[in-house]
Amino acid sequence: MRFLLYDRVTSIDKGKSITGIKTFTLTEPFLDRHFSRKPLVPSVMFIETMAQLLGWLIIYSHDFQLTTFLSLIEGANVPPGLRPGFQAEVHAEIASTHSRDSLGRATLHVEGVQVACIERIIYGHFHKVDPHLLRRQFGYYSGLEEL
């Protein structure tokens, strides 16, 4: 994973929801030489952060027997950019999940105020995976020790 856009998972409820945090700092690789006078976190990074957490929730909820690929985002509301130096809390939930795809939604809050959301995210499922590898990756990337 080239850009892991969350720092850790703070809670997960199988088949239902996931919450995680991300601290956006001035030293983010995607800000390097991108903005000369007033660095701003690009809005697409908020979308990617929310999408990554929802993707892992789906994989976790299916017992690491599949991986996901993003197929649709609708109703995305994101800020035009925020200055680095803030911590975001991301919450994502599954609305429905089946063997072929999953539907979810996500929000991103800064200091308790919702600043971004995606009303509808659809992920397709890919079933030819190594469940043990996915479980190890999730344990490492999430910061959850019990996996």
Task: Describe each region flagged by the PLM.
Residues 53-91, 117-119, 123-124:
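Hydrophobic beta-strand-centered segment that forms part of the acyl-chain substrate-binding groove
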Residues 11-17, 81-84, 111-113:
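A short, structured loop/turn motif at beta-sheet edges
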Residues 34-42, 46-55, 70:
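Compact, glycine-rich, soluble single-domain proteins
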Residues 1-41:
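Catalytic strand-loop segment that frames the active site of acyl-thioester-processing enzymes
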Residues 3-5, 88, 102:
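Hydrophobic core residues within well-ordered beta-strands of beta-rich domains
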Residues 8-11, 75, 80, 94-96:
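A residue-level detector for short acidic-glycine micro-motifs
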Residues 84, 93-147:
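HotDog/MaoC-like acyl-thioester-processing domains
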Residues 22, 91-94:
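Short, hydrophobic/aromatic-enriched beta-strand segments in well-ordered soluble domains
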